Structures are given as C-alpha cells and as structure tokens.
Amino acid sequence: MGRDEEAAARAEAWNHGFGFIKTSVIKTAIELEIPDILHNHGAPLSLSALSSAVGVPPDRLHRIMRFLTHHGVSKKTASPPGESDYYYAETAVSRSLTKDNLGAFVLLQGAQRGPSACITAQGLKSRERPGVEELGSDPLYEDPIFTKMVFRDAMACHARLTTSAVIENYGEGFRGVGSLVDVGGSYGMTLGMLVEAFPWIRGICYDLPQVVAKAKPLHGVEFVAGSMFESVPEADVVMLMFVLHNWSDNECIDILKRCKEAIPRETGKVMIIDAIIEEDGEGDEFAEARLGLDVTMMAVTFEGKERTHREWAFILKEAGFRKYVVKNIKALESLIEAYP
C-alpha cells in the first residue's frame, strides 16, 4: 500500500469513527427546524437571521452550518455587496429533511439510543431471540409524547412518501382492481390515499383488534380486525407494505399463504412493498439506506430482514406463488407483484 492509499484509508477510518456525529448534527438541525426555515424563506438567509430564528449563538451555528454544508444539507452562497455575513440556501437534501418530507423519520432514527436500536457484538453472537432483559428498553418508548409525536410522525411520513411513489409510478397496476385489502394497514392512511387516487377501489384495512378499535372512519375504507397468521379478508388484491421485513422466512411463508387464499386464482395478485437488497450490496442511490435498514431490522426484530432477489424468490415459491414481477417505484422500497 502506497502512502496516498494509506492516508486515504486512515481518513476513511476517521470518518467511520465520527459517523455518529453526522446523525447527531442532522437530528439537531431538524429539531431546530433549519431545513424548514431555509425552505420557507425561499432565498439565501444570513447567518445572523438564521441565528435569531433558531435561538443559537452565531458562532456555534456557523460551525453547525459549515458541517451541514459539507454534507450537502445546506449551501453557502455569496453575500450581498458590502456585507460580511455568511448566507445559506436550501438544497435538494435539506428539502428532503423538512417536516413534510423525511424529517420526522430521520429524527426518529437519530433519537433512538437504547440497546434495541443498535447492533452489539454479543447480540450478533446469540442464536436466541432476545427477551426484554437482554434487549433492554429505550426510555424514549416509555415517553408517551415521544411515542405519539416522534414515532407516529416518523412512521406516517415514511408511509406517506412511499404511497405517493406507488401512486405516481404504479398507477396502471390498479386498473380493474375492484377491492384491495391492506394487511397490517394500521389506521388506514395508506389505503385512504390509494382510494382517493383510485376511487373505484373498495378498500379493506386489516389489522389487529386493538389497532382497528382506535381507527377513525375513512371514506371508501372498511376496517376489519383479525390476525394475518390465521386468515385474510377476500379481495382482488392483497397488499403488504412494510410488513414482511418484520418476520422470519417461515413466518413470511405462512402470511403469504393466507394472502394467496384470499385472492382469485386467475385474476388476483399480492402486492408486496418492501426493500430489495442487491446480492453484492450495490445498487442505485438508495443502496446504502437499504443496507442500513437491513441492519436496523436485525437489531430491532432479531429475525426480520430486508431480502435479496434470491430470498424473495424462495419465500414466494414456498408460499405457492407461480411467478412474481418486481416494479421499480423510484423509492427505497420496490413493489413485488406475486401471482398464484
């Protein structure tokens, strides 16, 4: 290894060592609403004005903005003639971190700090599903305000963005669909968006009784309580969004068998919306996020995971599906059409 390669390797090692700082700074920027302020202002904003807006001294804020600019979360612009103040503008990345975009989801990832939110050497060595004593608990989840606001908002923003991607890039897939059941559909936000976009669909939101009991009425959506391990309501299409990555292969096969029983053999299909990992870990611009999500699932579910094409093919075949087609919806997740 030459000196240049060695220096580059050491620099990369330093970057890994300080990797947590990036998450921390971006989390703080979201809490201070910096992405929203830059977006709503609509033009470059001075450091002094931004300092007044967020309540952080200019000398400290300058260092934070310098860090954010290095990572593309803001853009330093030229100062007006006669001014010496720093000016910052939004970027495509900062727009993605606003409250109406992925801000809440990124905030959740940065907020978690308990044993269940990280990978440990001991956890990787264990072959047993961890109990509460081993896994520990994140005090954040004992805080009702956190659970209600941060966690709920994070899950909602993720679902909203993915559903929008489905509507925009898979609209033709809903032609001729008379009924659709969303398995694990929670309070029906995703299904409500789909029914609004494709009003000819009769939506069935299927979840556990304790979830359905708290759901508010939605136009075009019927709420049904039950367990996906026992049965699934009959429909033209069964949808599983962010569901199967929580479960082991055997559990996924059981769930998919119940879904297969619920659709017409000749015309029905199961829609799976989850990430697909490339065999070599490479891929498009979402590749790193998918790998990170896979490791997260290993930490918080033990047997859950993001699957490769080969792994998806295996569980679909074992569940009795004769073929499947992968659709690119230009998101972290892909859409898999599975046919009985």
UniProtKB/Swiss-Prot annotation:
It is an enzyme of class 2 (transferase). Signal peptide: none annotated. SUPFAM superfamilies: S-adenosyl-L-methionine-dependent methyltransferases (SSF53335), Winged helix' DNA-binding domain (SSF46785). Expressed in leaves. The active site is at 245 (proton acceptor). GO terms for biological process: methylation. Gene3D superfamilies: Vaccinia Virus protein VP39 (3.40.50.150), Winged helix-like DNA-binding domain superfamily/Winged helix DNA-binding domain (1.10.10.10). It comes from the Eukaryota. This is Flavonoid 7-O-methyltransferase 2. It comes from Ocimum basilicum (Sweet basil). The lineage of its organism: Eukaryota, Viridiplantae, Streptophyta, Embryophyta, Tracheophyta.
